[in-house]
Amino acid sequence: SPEDLLRLEDRYADRLVAPAIAAGTAAIVAHRARAWIDLNRAEDDLDPEMVSPRMDGFKASNSLKMRGGLGLIPRRLLHAGDLWKRPLSSEDIKHRLEQFHRPYHLAIERSLLNIRNRFGTALLVDVHSMPPLTATAMPAPRIVIGDRFGQSAPSLYAEMLIERARSLNVAAALNHPYPGDYILRRHGNAQGNIHAIQIEVDRSLYLDSMLREPGPG
């Protein structure tokens, strides 16, 4: 249903970075819903059950996300079941890769290289939204910073962001439950002075009570 698909959207997340864009920061905004193709998954994170007939020479990654139904093309959602009535054709998959997935990552690569070459270092901030989390013993984080446990960026970046969130009385966490995925793995390159971090923002911080439209936050 449309309500279920909303859970797969980083709804209005581009508005979170509008001030940075206005200040001159380079930004690349995805305009395809995650249900269509997940840009935060590798090409081999494709569930073989999603394609008919099978793609020649294709070997799936067997990643945990893919096996859980949230691969390159999400197949199912918890409490919602299957998202597609039938498997997709191999031509459809290739079209989505060639027209959306590959150009998106190529644009990121080019932008990071240009910035690194100009300033000596570059930082990718990968902005997403998340559903409100639940917690028991302590307040649930409303912002989660991911650096793949220090693999995609020096810890200084994450520490600065968490400190900033807490200074605004917003509960923040590091790498739990979202450490970052393919975008950070692909584009973070510490040896090349290109660093990458992920920011997950609780949708209730900036959307209305129905989590559909921009709110007062």
Predicted regions, residues:
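N-terminal catalytic or cofactor-binding beta/alpha core of small enzyme domains
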Residues: 1-124, 129-217
